[in-house]
Amino acid sequence: MKDILLEAGFPLQFSEEAIEESLRIPTTITEKEIKTRRDLRGTCTFTIDPLDAKDFDDALSFQLLPSGQYEIGIHIADVSHYIEEGETLDQESYTRGTSVYLPDRVNPMLPENISNVLCSLRPLEDKLTFSVIVEITPNGKILSKWIGKTIIH
């Protein structure tokens, strides 16, 4: 499997500079940052991933509103909050373009402490996300939609 990645030009290792840069990223979410986002930490949010997954990069939420309508949320990890444009991590992730999932391994687009920890939408942790929130009728008619920065738990 490693040969497939090498033949496709996919780097197997991150540069030392990229690893060091990833370790310097602050892990605390500030109150200032929370105030700039729609707070969905009180909404039941869940991922749908294999049991052995570590990089939970997307999540869903669903709730019945008092009006009888439904609210559906689609949430994706806000990696852009942590990766500065033009920096080494940005350049290396651009070169990779994606994480590659093979039967025996995952070669991530970003170092594991970002993909599996900082930006992984793990249970019982506050995480920064981009979300699409859609309100629909029981018949599926879209009543409203909202797209923006959020924080989920």
Where are these regions (language model features)?
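Beta-strand residues in well-ordered beta-sheet regions across diverse protein folds
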Residues: 73-75, 145
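Short beta-strand segments
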Residues: 75-77, 135
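Charge-lined substrate channels and their catalytic hotspots, especially those that engage the 3′ end
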Residues: 1-73, 80-125
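Polynucleotide-recognition surfaces of large bacterial nucleic-acid defense/processing enzymes
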Residues: 127-153
